């Protein structure tokens, strides 16, 4: 029996660089999100300050970007779920401690290859219409050029200025890998495990990496990095595809159930 299929079934039951790559997530040209429209969206926080986005993929696990890892003990690391506002009281908002940070073992911090991070929460989430996991893509499919997908974040909305308190969302078209690898784009730096997406003056950008790129109601990629300036038509946002890492994700979550809780 294929172990990855077995582990995927378990997860479903539980859930009901040279191109000057920088952390992304400032949602340029987006709009305020509404309550319960992003029940899977996570705010990863250190000392109660938003650091990165993430996506709830089971009742105990959040997927984010490896460059969001803290390199310190997890005592000050928490995940906020069910939130639209980072600071205002909200009926469905919950905050949970992070028990483990597990970056992909092949993560390359220079080129941001394999830029994925799993966060194990200290306890299982009580699922509701405002807090629930999002299915992620498990098949290595090509996302068509021009396909419009959703991205969201709490990062800055302008090159300078205050970060928003309200979650921003944006429809954004995917760009083919061939185009993104042209010399005047990223000059063959985009691997088969990455995709690009951008629209004029609309982009994810610095300050909110780790959130999901959602196509047809499925998380297909994680906000990764891009050029030092955001919103440039030939320097689109870069995203790490999830499907190529399906086995690592499911096996990591399964193996964690066999380990004692960290002190």
UniProtKB/Swiss-Prot annotation:
In which tissues is this gene expressed?
In the embryo, localizes to paraxial regions at the neurula stage and anterior ventral regions at the tailbud stage. From the late tailbud to tadpole stage, expressed along the forming blood vessels including the anterior cardinal veins, posterior cardinal veins, intersomitic veins, dorsal longitudinal anastomosing vessel, dorsal aorta, pronephric sinus and most prominently around the vascular vitelline network, where expression shows left-right asymmetry in the stage 42 embryo. Localizes to endothelial cells.
Q: Its Enzyme Commission number?
A: 3.4.21.-
Q: Which residues form the propeptide?
A: 22-26
- Give all cystine bridges in this chain: 52-68, 149-215, 180-196, 205-230
Where located?
Secreted
Q: Write down the SMART domains for this protein, in alphabetical order.
A: Tryp_SPc
Please state the span of the N-terminal signal peptide per the UniProt entry: 1-21
Q: Which GO terms describe its molecular function?
A: serine-type endopeptidase activity
Does the UniProt entry include the keyword Endoplasmic reticulum? no
Tell me which GO cellular component terms the UniProt record holds.
Answer: extracellular space
Q: What region holds the Peptidase S1 domain? A: 27-254
Record keywords, A-Z: Disulfide bond, Glycoprotein, Hydrolase, Protease, Secreted, Serine protease, Signal, Zymogen
Task: Give the positions the UniProt entry annotates as the active site.
Answer: 67, 115, 209
Q: For this chain's UniProt record, which GO biological process terms are given? A: protein maturation; proteolysis
Protease as a keyword of this entry, yes or no, is yes
Positions of glycan attachment: 2, 73-74, 108, 255
**Pfam families (alphabetical):** Trypsin
- The top EC class, named as a word, is hydrolase
As for what it does, the entry says: Probable serine protease.
Q: What else is known?
A: Was named 'ami' because of its expression pattern; 'ami' means 'mesh' or 'net' in Japanese.
UniProt lists the family membership as follows: Belongs to the peptidase S1 family.
Q: PANTHER family annotated for this entry?
A: COMPLEMENT FACTOR D, KALLIKREIN-RELATED
Q: What is the protein name given in its UniProt record?
A: Serine protease ami
């Amino acid at each position: 029996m294929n172990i990855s299929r077995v582990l995927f079934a378990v997860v479903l039951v539980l859930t009901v660089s040279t191109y000057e790559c920088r952390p992304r997530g400032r949602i340029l040209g987006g709009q305020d999100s509404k309550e319960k429209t992003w029940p899977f969206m996570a705010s990863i926080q250190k000392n109660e300050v938003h650091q990165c986005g993430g996506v709830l993929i089971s009742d105990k696990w959040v997927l984010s970007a490896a460059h969001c890892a803290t390199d310190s003990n997890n005592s000050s690391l928490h995940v906020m779920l069910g939130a639209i506002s980072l600071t205002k009281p909200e009926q469905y908002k919950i905050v949970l401690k992070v028990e483990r940070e597990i970056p992909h073992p092949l993560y390359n911090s220079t080129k941001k290859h394999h830029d994925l991070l799993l966060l194990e929460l200290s306890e299982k989430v009580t699922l509701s219409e405002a807090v629930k996991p999002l299915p992620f893509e498990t098949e290595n499919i090509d996302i068509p050029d021009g396909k419009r997908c959703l991205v969201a974040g709490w990062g800055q909305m302008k090159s300078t200025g205050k970060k928003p308190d309200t979650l921003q969302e944006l429809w954004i078209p995917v760009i083919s890998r061939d185009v993104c690898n042209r010399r005047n784009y990223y000059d063959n730096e985009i691997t088969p495990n990455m995709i690009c997406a951008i629209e004029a003056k609309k982009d994810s950008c610095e300050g909110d990496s780790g959130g999901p790129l959602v196509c047809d109601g499925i998380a297909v990629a994680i906000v990764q990095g891009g050029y030092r300036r955001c919103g440039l038509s030939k320097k689109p946002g870069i995203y790490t595809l999830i499907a190529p890492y399906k086995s690592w994700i499911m096996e990591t979550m399964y193996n964690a159930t066999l380990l004692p809780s960290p002190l």
